[in-house]
Each structure stands twice: as structure tokens, then as C-alpha cells.
């Protein structure tokens, strides 16, 4: 089992009190670093944030900022941006200058109106500001490859990362998008459309929640290996980033399951594992080892 020396997780969720716990598990698993998306689950939705006039939520990341300050070699973070925040440009500039602030995230896949806005250019002002400030942007907008293609063409200087394999799991599809579930063949055909985004050199793919999206266990992982092979063949290992989404795994798999299913994959060369399990993220986010 080949193992890269520098494993970096592209997405974990932690909140108050979670830094020491995350470090202990990372040390046990041999994970060198992780990108934090601070998002608290349970209680009030979308915490932490400041609530602005008109119901606009301004996400903040106090735990992630603290983690990056205390352990700059182990943690960096992204910041979510509300597309309706009137001060979005200032927030993006502040993140650009913040220690450990590496990227932005938007989530138009959370509701049908947001999906429609993404497809029709309603997020373009955020994309433009991200590109102007040199910040990569992760977008959670599953089942919407045409909207990603439009954005990639409109903003060729934007480093755009497709979240979570670019497709919904059926549970997310029926709840978030209010769409009917898809069979396995339909899901794979949709994923092929996502892979066509590899034609845009400014687009990368986050390999996260794959076990839920394709309904196959992360460990041992044999069912996912051919699908990941297709992704690497399309994008190249330099544009595929592994993410555990630790603490919010839809199938209840532990961090070790999610990592070791990748490490045990015989379809990836040692060099490809090095890229997918860390080097791609560091390269795209300008995060030195």
C-alpha cells in the first residue's frame, strides 16, 4: 500500500473545542494538514454567522481562524460567502489577507432558487471578485455541470473547484433540489457530464462524499476505484482533490475508512496518490508544504 508523505484533507468541519480532537486523529492517521470549512451542524442552521438585514447570513470562521493561527502548518481554511451579502467584495479582500485564508465557498445546490441563480449568472459578482483577488472558489452545485461550464468560460482566471463529485446523492437530490432520485446508470451518465468539465483548465474536482454519491462503501472501496479512475483519467491527478468531509460523512464512515479506501486503491500510481491526496490541493490553493 503506497502512502504519500504529505496527505492533506481538502475538507473537514470542526467547531468550538474541535481543534485538539482533529489534530489527535490526524496524527493517528498520518494526515499532515487539512482545510477547514467551519460549519456547525445541529441547532440553528448555517452557524456560525452574523445575521444581517433582510435575513442575509454572513458566515464567519472563528475556530478555523484560531486553528490556522495556532497550527499554521496543519490547518488552513475556506470561508463561505452569501451571494446576497452587500459587503461581499470587502469580505473577499479580508480573506485574501488573512493568515491561513485560502479559498471561498458558495453553495447554490442547497435550494432550487439558488440553483437557478447559479445557472443564470446570479453568482457572477462573487466569482469575479474571487478571480480578481486570486482566491480559488469551491462551489457546491451538484447535478449542474452546464452552470459550471458557463462560469468557467466567463471567468477563465478563476480557479473553480467542483464540490463533492459534482452530483447529488439521492437523499440530497430529493431534499435539497426537490428532484426525483436517479438509478445507478443515470447517476453515472450525469457524472460523465461532470467529467466533461475537465475541458476547462481552470476547473478541478473535489473527490468528496463519493461513497454517498455513488452508494458504494468507502472501505474497502473497490466499488469506487473505477469511478475515481475515470475522474483521474479526465482531469488528471493534478486536478482531483480528496476530501473526507470528516464529521459530516453521510454514510457514517469514520475518517480512517475514508482515507484507507484511498490508500488501498491499486488503480492509482504512487504519483497519482501524491497528487490526489494532497499535492493538488496545495498547488491550487498556493499552500506550501
Label the model's feature ranges.
Residues 9-17, 76-85, 112-117, 178-183, ...:
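Active-site mouth loops of central-metabolism enzymes
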Residues 47-143, 150:
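Active-site gating/metal-coordination segments in enzymes
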Residues 16-26, 85-96, 190:
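Short, acidic/polar
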Residues 116-241:
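Catalytic pocket-lining loop regions of alpha/beta-barrel enzymes
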Residues 11, 26, 95, 130, ...:
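Conserved, mostly hydrophobic/aromatic
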Residues 1-10, 16-33, 37, 230, ...:
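Mid-to-C-terminal alpha-helical segments outside catalytic/metal-binding sites
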Residues 15-17, 41-44, 84-87, 110-113, ...:
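Active-site environment of divalent metal-dependent phosphoester hydrolases
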Residues 7-12, 34-36, 75-79, 102-106, ...:
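Hydrophobic faces of well-ordered beta-strands that scaffold small-molecule active sites
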Amino acid at each position: 500500500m503506497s502512502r504519500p508523505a504529505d496527505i492533506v484533507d481538502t475538507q473537514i468541519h470542526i467547531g468550538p473545542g474541535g481543534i485538539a480532537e482533529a489534530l489527535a486523529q490526524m496524527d493517528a492517521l498520518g494526515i499532515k494538514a487539512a482545510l477547514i470549512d467551519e460549519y456547525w451542524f445541529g441547532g440553528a442552521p448555517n452557524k456560525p454567522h452574523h445575521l444581517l438585514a433582510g435575513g442575509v447570513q454572513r458566515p464567519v470562521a472563528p475556530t478555523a481562524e484560531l486553528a490556522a493561527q495556532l497550527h499554521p502548518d496543519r490547518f488552513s481554511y475556506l470561508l463561505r460567502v452569501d451571494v446576497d451579502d452587500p459587503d461581499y467584495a470587502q469580505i473577499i479582500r479580508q480573506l485574501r489577507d488573512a493568515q491561513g485564508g485560502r479559498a471561498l465557498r458558495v453553495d447554490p445546490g442547497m435550494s432550487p432558487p439558488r440553483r437557478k441563480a447559479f445557472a443564470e449568472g446570479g453568482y457572477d459578482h462573487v466569482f469575479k471578485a474571487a478571480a480578481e483577488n486570486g482566491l480559488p472558489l469551491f462551489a457546491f452545485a451538484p447535478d449542474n455541470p452546464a452552470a459550471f461550464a458557463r462560469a468557467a468560460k466567463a471567468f477563465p482566471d478563476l480557479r473553480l473547484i467542483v464540490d463533492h463529485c459534482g452530483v447529488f446523492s439521492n437523499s440530497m437530490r430529493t431534499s435539497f433540489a426537490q428532484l426525483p432520485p436517479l438509478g445507478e446508470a443515470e447517476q453515472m451518465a450525469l457524472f460523465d457530464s461532470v467529467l466533461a468539465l475537465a475541458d476547462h483548465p481552470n476547473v478541478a474536482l473535489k473527490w468528496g462524499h463519493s461513497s454517498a454519491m455513488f452508494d458504494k462503501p468507502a472501505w474497502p472501496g473497490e466499488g469506487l476505484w473505477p469511478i475515481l479512475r475515470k475522474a483521474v483519467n479526465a482531469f488528471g491527478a493534478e486536478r482531483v482533490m480528496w476530501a473526507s468531509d470528516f464529521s459530516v460523512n453521510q454514510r457514517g464512515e469514520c475518517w480512517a475508512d475514508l482515507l484507507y479506501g484511498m490508500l488501498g486503491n491499486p488503480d492509482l500510481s504512487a504519483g497519482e496518490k501524491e497528487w490526489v491526496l494532497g499535492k493538488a490541493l496545495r498547488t491550487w490553493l498556493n499552500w506550501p508544504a
